[in-house]
A protein has these predicted regions:
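HTH-adjacent hinge/linker in prokaryotic transcriptional regulators
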Residues: 36-74
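Long, low-complexity, charge-rich intrinsically disordered regions
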Residues: 58-177
Length: 177
């Protein structure tokens, strides 16, 4: 929330988008009523609703365009030591919220060694999905943001994932904290 009041240059640098894009996005958030001016500071009108709208957009527009590869294979315990960050169920498993038989990860570098060592085979219906990050290279993470974990779980359209997404929302995202 404090980032709402950063200067546009800082927001552009942090997010990896152009200064013009930051201006457009902030104007859109203000004009659509998502942001309110509270004595010179921007605040969310309904942060939870805005998160929900972003997750819908992610599922319907952004996710279909993300480059992804699917594989079948065994998921080794150390697989995330390779150039990958866990998303969705895999991230929820690291938070000890569920046990998953699938791997969803965003590659952060070359994962060919992982594929070869574990003998993963390309398979459109495989239990392993590796996605190309959709954020700019200048923006590095040591873990996937909770908002993305939440959105990935909701995009699964599975009751178990939806329940876990609710736990993540309540623990890390709810504006009622």
């Amino acid at each position: 929330p404090e980032a709402l009041n950063w200067g546009y240059r800082n927001l552009a640098q942090y997010s990896g988008v152009s200064l013009g894009s930051v201006g457009y996005i902030m104007a859109d958030l203000q004009n659509s009523g998502h942001l309110l001016d509270a004595d010179g500071n921007w605040v969310w009108k309904d942060r939870n609703n805005t998160i929900g709208k972003w997750c819908d957009y992610y599922r319907d527009k952004l996710l279909p365009g993300i480059e992804k590869r699917r594989y079948s294979g065994t998921i080794p315990d150390n697989c995330l030591e390779y150039a990958m960050l866990p998303g969705g169920e895999s991230a929820a498993e690291q938070l000890h919220l569920l046990k998953s038989s699938r791997l969803l990860a965003y590659r952060t570098g070359n994962i060919n060694l992982c594929i070869a060592q574990n003998r993963w085979k390309e398979d459109i219906d495989g239990n392993i999905e590796i996605r190309t990050p959709f954020w700019p290279e200048c923006r590095t993470f040591d873990k996937i943001p909770y908002l993305l974990i939440y959105a990935d779980l909701l995009a699964e359209d599975d009751s178990r994932c939806t329940e876990i997404a609710g736990e993540i929302f309540n623990r890390f995202l709810s504006g009622d904290q």
